[in-house]
């Protein structure tokens, strides 16, 4: 075992070739991790879920305004950086060139940024907003346009601006100024050398915990949807036990990618995943009609821009229904993105060395926002248009024949509910049920049960596959698209886990940009353990509560980091001006 510390490096302990840690940060993060998992396992269940929901609601009620204000502030700061006088500064030496091609760079940041979530929510969120329109939004938008605009709002400019700010700050301090690739470095212009002590240890530990909570949420979501896809394809039963087994299996795949490293592992998988995801999107686009997709893309963009100013600052301060909606949707998303920002920001910084600030902001904010909007249009608009067209068809047939037809729609078993909205069980223990033709919109809100009536189906992770089934008449195309979607989710899962373990390892090793593989394997396993524990404790709502809670203290860190970046850029600009003045002074005539 060896220990080393210099004026430019944080203390590190090295055990052999494969383990390197910052003694305080690593130990503190592991202790918190063990406590979290122990509490989730020992006290998991309805009571634990209730406490998680109450904590989430308490934070939303008292600090929702902070999430809303900070995310809009991050977007404004990103625009200022891209258009300001520091936009030419390179993240590294002045003569340094980007390490990765633009295509590889984009594939890696997008796969890490929000891949699992986009697949999970691209169908479910537009349906939710369509069925329960957000209260108090701008007039002039019909239900479909409003649902799509709000969905794109949550996945558009704001989260990518946040990632850009965090990634830019880390890259600037790490590659331009030569500081440790660590979150404490971002606070140095404001807090001075105190960040190299215990205060910095706290900041880096917060970054690790926020990352674990954010990634655990995504891994839990991914496990639910992989379970739904395998159930659709192979009849594998759904449930928490199956999902935890899937987390274990896919985490094992992620460890293989960890061993292969950044170039052979994450980069190759990200490039493959982008190709497969693009293929899935094309299937949906041509299945729903290319012209309809292009028309919807333009209309959705206009609707998004129409609501953007109002929604960016909306807290629901004057209406309890609006406040509840903002807390359940916008505040959750903003907190989720903030808890993801240490991971995504650090990863983007790690693969963005050599790019200018303008190139970095443009690539990280604009391109993924456009792709996310197109993706959501392909899936979300197809879902809503299919539903409205079937309703119109049924209405026309009802007027003419009094026998409305839902021909072409698959049938599902829907359970009957009692007066308390509970499924009715028959004497043999199965749910009372009838077979009904459903669109994807109707499916999400229906009490769907398994064909044998033994169990209720979680429609949220399943609705993506229902959309696919209702869009294609050919069983072969349905199986191809469902299989493709399931593989994409698995690959997004693997790249997210691998990328996050690399980022956590960088922080926990004291800012080493290339930490050894042993501790990265440990963090990959830890992410799967946290996701499994939170699923056991209370499912998706427990995962959401963990993300909202972990994001709160880190929001303060990010606000101070923005201040620190502005100061550091100003100092760099002044040094460049001084250098230019010295160079431009003519030689003395008397000399």
Model regions and ranges:
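N-terminal alpha-helical transmembrane segments of multi-pass membrane transport
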Residues: 2-143, 259, 282, 286, ...
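Membrane-interface helix-loop-helix modules in multi-pass membrane proteins
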Residues: 74-81, 85-181, 374-379, 383-384, ...
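Transmembrane-helix boundary/entry motifs in multi-pass membrane transporters
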Residues: 16-25, 60-64, 94-112, 146-157, ...
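Helix-loop-helix module between adjacent transmembrane segments
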Residues: 17-28, 32-42, 75-78, 114-118, ...
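Low-complexity, proline/glycine-enriched hydrophobic segments characteristic of transmembrane helices
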Residues: 315-319, 380-473
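Transmembrane alpha-helical segments of multi-pass small-molecule transport proteins
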Residues: 5, 28-43, 68-75, 234-260, ...
């Amino acid at each position: 075992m060896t220990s080393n510390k210099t004026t430019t490096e944080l203390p590190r302990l090295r055990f052999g070739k494969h383990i390197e840690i910052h003694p305080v940060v690593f130990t503190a993060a592991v202790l918190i991790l063990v406590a979290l998992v122990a509490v989730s396992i020992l006290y998991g269940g309805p009571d634990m879920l209730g406490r998680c929901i109450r904590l989430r609601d308490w934070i939303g009620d008292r600090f929702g305004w902070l999430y809303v204000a900070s995310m809009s502030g991050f977007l404004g700061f990103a625009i200022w950086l891209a258009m300001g006088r520091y936009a030419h500064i390179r993240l590294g030496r002045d003569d340094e060139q980007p390490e990765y091609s633009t295509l590889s760079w984009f594939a890696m940041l997008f796969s890490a940024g929000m891949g699992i979530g986009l697949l999970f929510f691209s169908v479910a969120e537009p349906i939710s907003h369509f069925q329960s329109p957000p209260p108090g939004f701008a007039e002039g938008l019909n239900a479909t346009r409003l649902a799509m605009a709000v969905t794109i709002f949550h996945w558009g400019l704001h989260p990518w601006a946040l990632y850009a700010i965090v990634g830019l700050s880390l890259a600037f301090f790490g590659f331009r100024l030569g500081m440790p690739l660590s979150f404490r470095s971002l606070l140095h212009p404001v807090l001075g050398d105190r960040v190299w002590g215990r205060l910095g240890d706290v900041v880096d530990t917060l970054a690790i915990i926020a990352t674990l909570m954010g990634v655990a949420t995504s891994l839990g979501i991914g496990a639910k949807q992989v379970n739904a896809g395998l159930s659709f394809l192979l009849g594998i039963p759904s449930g928490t036990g199956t999902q935890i087994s899937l987390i274990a299996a896919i985490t094992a795949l992620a460890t293989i990618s960890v061993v292969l490293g950044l170039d052979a592992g994450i980069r190759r998988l990200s490039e493959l995943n982008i190709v497969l995801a693009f293929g899935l999107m094309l299937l949906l686009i041509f299945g729903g009609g290319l012209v309809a997709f292009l028309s919807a893309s333009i209309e959705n963009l206009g609707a998004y821009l129409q609501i953007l100013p109002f929604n960016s600052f909306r807290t629901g301060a004057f209406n309890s229904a609006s406040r509840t909606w903002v807390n359940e949707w916008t505040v959750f998303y903003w907190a989720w993105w903030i808890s993801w920002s240490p991971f995504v920001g650090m990863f983007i910084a790690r693969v963005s060395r050599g790019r200018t600030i303008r190139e970095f902001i443009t690539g990280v904010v604009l391109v993924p926002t456009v792709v996310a909007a197109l993706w959501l249009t392909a899936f979300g608009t197809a879902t809503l248009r299919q539903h409205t067209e079937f309703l119109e068809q049924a209405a026309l047939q009802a007027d003419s024949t009094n026998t409305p037809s839902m021909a072409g729609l698959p049938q599902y078993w829907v359970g009957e509910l009692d007066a308390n909205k509970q499924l009715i069980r028959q004497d043999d223990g199965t749910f009372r049920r009838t077979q009904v033709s459903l669109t994807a919109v109707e499916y999400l809100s229906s009490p769907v049960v398994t064909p044998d009536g033994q169990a209720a189906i979680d429609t949220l992770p399943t609705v993506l596959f229902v959309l696919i089934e209702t869009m294609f008449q050919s069983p072969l195309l349905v199986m191809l698209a469902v299989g493709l979607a399931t593989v994409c989710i698995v690959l997004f899962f693997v790249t997210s886990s691998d990328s996050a373990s690399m980022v956590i390892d960088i922080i926990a090793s004291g800012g080493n940009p290339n930490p050894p593989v042993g501790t990265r394997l440990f963090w990959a396993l830890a992410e799967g353990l946290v996701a499994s524990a939170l699923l056991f404790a209370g499912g998706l709502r427990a995962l959401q509560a963990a993300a909202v809670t972990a994001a709160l203290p880190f929001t303060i860190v990010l606000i101070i980091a923005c201040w620190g970046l502005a100061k550091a850029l100003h100092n760099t600009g002044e040094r460049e001006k001084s250098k230019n003045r010295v160079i431009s002074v003519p030689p003395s005539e008397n000399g």
